[in-house]
Amino acid sequence: ETGKKIAVIGGGPAGLTAARELKRYGHNVTIFEKEKQLGGMLVDGIPRFRLPLDLIEEEIGLITETGINVVYGEFIDEAKFNNLLKEYDSVVVATGTTNANITPIEGLSKDHYSTGLEFMKEYNSGNIKDLKGDVIIIGGGFTAIDTARACARTAKRILGENGEVTIVYRRTVEHMAVDLKELNEMDKENIKIRTLLSPLEGVIENNELSGIKFVRNYLGKGKESGKPEILPVEDSEFTMNAKHLILAIGQKQDYSILPTGVEVTGKFTTNNPKIFVAGDFSSGSLDVIHSVADGKEVAELIDTTLVGIKRREKFLKIEEASDNGESGRFRNHDQQFTTESETIEVENRVDSDNEVDLGFRGTQVNEHATRCYFCHYKFEIDHEKCIHCNWCIDVTPRNCIKKIEKFDYTEDGVIEKAYETKNDEDASFIWIDTKNCIRCGKCLRTCPTRAISMRKTTLVKEP
């Protein structure tokens, strides 16, 4: 036990992970959670058919059982935050992105729509009523997709009853946060997607929403963000029927929780040495695994700051591996393509607690495991021994081994850029591009001068 006390504001993925790691370091940790349960977006934002509640509760239980203190129903304002700074050695802010982005739509008040976050919280808590009539969801990200699939269940659209659930997005499907499998599942659930549309104004009858007026878009040149510019098509306005409107266009941090004068200065730091940030509050809306990683990193930073030394080091262990290049991976593994995981039948999806994607089962697990590229094995060429015979180039996959004229290096000596050439006369090096290497070992076995070696790298963490 270090005797140090740390407050974690927010019991979502980042806060829970930070608390667990800080407890492992020997600190006294207290989580302050404004809701009546821990989990954050795990319980409020991600639908049960994607992430079952019993799994979440089991994982949270494993963390809290380590001796972490939890204060529920505690909203931290500036006065309470300042008190925490007096009582605790460090404070971690991991409250996520709780403020929904709102696009102004003429003629609509807050009574005429809900946000994706609001809807998903009500849906996951079981407090939402069955929707009647057409539902429009504005957005093209993860929240919009989850909201639409939740609406399909709430409105019983899955079974084909009257009315439609429609996602409306201002760009094209290619720019949405959705893959082909998700599109197929939404199609099964009778969810419509309409693209290249932007909302203009709401149509109100008897103080209730009856439709949304849209304008059609076309895409211009790419902007600095990488996405194409959105331009309106003249005289293309039209109205879609809608009894319910949900705005699911992302969310942002609520910085008002920070005391006056405190600003975020880095990924985990602020201009107050006692206050740290992590997860979505630090980086914006990402995914759960990034928030978990943030929790681990901020805990290590806090421990180092409080104790004065870095107590858990990471280093790479490099050792010679097989002298014949055998990694256990063969060229025919490239022909093993992904297969679809099993999903439950559409008629069983009305119950919002039924997990849809059942994952890989039986032989599928082994089949997918053999697709691993074994990136911990690294093949390298000793340029002192290489005679530029090109035999390795001839036997390996295309673009794996290249003729290089010169390299650019970082200050740490890492290759930053390789200048490839097709001419033998200009080639100063023969180089293995590890990003394209499939670890088949053929280059090592065919090399006449034994210039190629195979090493195994392992990330080692001190306990």
Predicted regions and their residues:
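General beta-strand structural signal in soluble alpha/beta enzymes
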Residues: 33, 72, 93-95, 115, ...
